[in-house]
């Protein structure tokens, strides 16, 4: 099924023409939803008045599937921490299920409750992370519990109830906007013209067909043992054959990274946010098992003997951070004037 969807959205399959009428219906529903929300919002209060709450940056995308939002969120959090600011993060928590919300991500988080991406963000940065299906509720809890200077939403571009002061869209340079159609005929959650109203577009990788303000490169760091504290250099597995496990939006990107590192991979792709059982990553051989950091947060409890994850970091030009900082300074200036 996944392969068929890939062909329709990113290949030349003619199924898109049969699905096109459903895309128009989808667009109609989106338009009605936005109109109704605008009416409701005019008479409702949002989580924290813009004049008193910290600036909110939404990092999202227009397409379904992985584009590189979470690495960019981590990079922004680390940037603000280096500046001495106190950032906080809100997230939907895809892949996690809790009896009650909002959920505060704490020490040794359970990805089955918080979701894999919030757990990863907290484990990498240590900053406050709050999860709720309704991100506005997560925001309110974050503001009630922490004195944050800036809030970042991991995804949420289409979550209309979430206030925002800056929108950053991430696009996978390899996939772009697919066939340019909205769901279900294409991968778009909103038409490409939505980019006209966002602040910044960041391309994850280089591609001539993607027009972006800035380019982000995901740089491999070190291999770290999934169940333990051991580390190895980025080229440690060069020349090896290994099982490659990935439950991310675009597993092909991870597999391509392994090929660049001269690793011959036996590929095992799972749906995004897949909840692993230990048997999923136990193979009848002695080959190492390699995975992404997002997968590793869900596998730490398995006590795997020879499983490793690749830590990656988002590398961006300093001009990107200068643009973000300038926007925050502008917001603070307006707040003082108000």
From Swiss-Prot:
UniProt superkingdom: Bacteria
Gene Ontology molecular functions: ATP binding; tetraacyldisaccharide 4'-kinase activity
Keyword Isomerase: no
Key words, A-Z: ATP-binding, Kinase, Lipid A biosynthesis, Lipid biosynthesis, Lipid metabolism, Nucleotide-binding, Transferase
This protein's record includes keyword 4Fe-4S: no
EC number: 2.7.1.130
GO cellular component labels: plasma membrane
CDD domains found in the cross-reference section: SIMIBI
Catalysed reactions, as listed in the record: a lipid A disaccharide + ATP = a lipid IVA + ADP + H(+)
Pathway: Glycolipid biosynthesis; lipid IV(A) biosynthesis; lipid IV(A) from (3R)-3-hydroxytetradecanoyl-[acyl-carrier-protein] and UDP-N-acetyl-alpha-D-glucosamine: step 6/6
Stored SUPFAM superfamilies: P-loop containing nucleoside triphosphate hydrolases
Residues given in the record as ATP binding sites: 63-70
Gene Ontology terms: biological process: lipid A biosynthetic process; lipopolysaccharide core region biosynthetic process
Function: Transfers the gamma-phosphate of ATP to the 4'-position of a tetraacyldisaccharide 1-phosphate intermediate (termed DS-1-P) to form tetraacyldisaccharide 1,4'-bis-phosphate (lipid IVA).
HAMAP family: LpxK (MF_00409)
Protein family: Belongs to the LpxK family.
Protein name in UniProt: Tetraacyldisaccharide 4'-kinase
Taxonomic source organism: Hahella chejuensis (strain KCTC 2396)
Gene coding for it: lpxK
């Amino acid at each position: 099924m996944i392969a068929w969807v890939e062909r329709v959205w990113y290949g030349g399959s003619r199924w898109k023409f049969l699905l096109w009428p459903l895309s128009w219906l989808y667009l109609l529903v989106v338009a009605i939803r936005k109109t109704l929300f605008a009416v409701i919002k005019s008479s409702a209060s949002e989580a924290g008045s813009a004049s008193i709450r910290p600036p909110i940056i939404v990092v999202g995308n227009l397409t379904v599937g992985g584009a590189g939002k979470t690495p960019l969120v981590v990079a922004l959090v680390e940037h603000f921490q280096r500046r001495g600011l106190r950032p906080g993060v809100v997230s939907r928590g895809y892949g996690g299920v809790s009896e009650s919300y909002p959920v505060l991500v704490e020490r040794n988080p359970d990805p089955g409750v918080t979701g894999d991406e919030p757990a990863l963000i907290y484990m990498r940065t240590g900053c406050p992370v709050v999860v709720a299906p309704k991100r506005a509720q997560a925001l309110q809890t974050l503001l009630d519990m922490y004195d944050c200077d800036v809030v970042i939403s991991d995804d949420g571009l289409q979550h209309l109830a979430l206030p925002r002061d800056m929108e950053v869209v991430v696009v996978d340079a390899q996939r772009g906007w697919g066939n340019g159609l909205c769901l279900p005929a294409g991968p778009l959650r909103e038409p490409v013209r939505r980019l006209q109203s966002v602040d910044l577009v960041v391309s994850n990788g280089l591609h001539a067909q993607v027009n972006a303000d800035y380019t982000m490169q995901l740089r491999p760091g070190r291999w770290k043992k999934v169940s333990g504290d051991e580390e190895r250099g980025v080229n440690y597995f060069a020349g090896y054959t290994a099982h490659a496990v990935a439950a991310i939006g675009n597993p092909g990107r991870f597999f391509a990274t392994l090929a660049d590192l001269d690793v011959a991979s036996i590929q095992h792709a799972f749906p995004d946010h897949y909840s692993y059982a230990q048997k999923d990553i136990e193979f009848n051989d002695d080959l190492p098992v390699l995975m992404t950091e997002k997968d590793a947060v869900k596998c730490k409890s398995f006590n795997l003997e020879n499983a490793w994850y690749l830590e990656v970091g988002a590398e961006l030009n300093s001009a990107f951070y200068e643009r973000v900082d300038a926007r925050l300074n502008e917001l603070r200036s307006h707040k003082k004037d108000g």
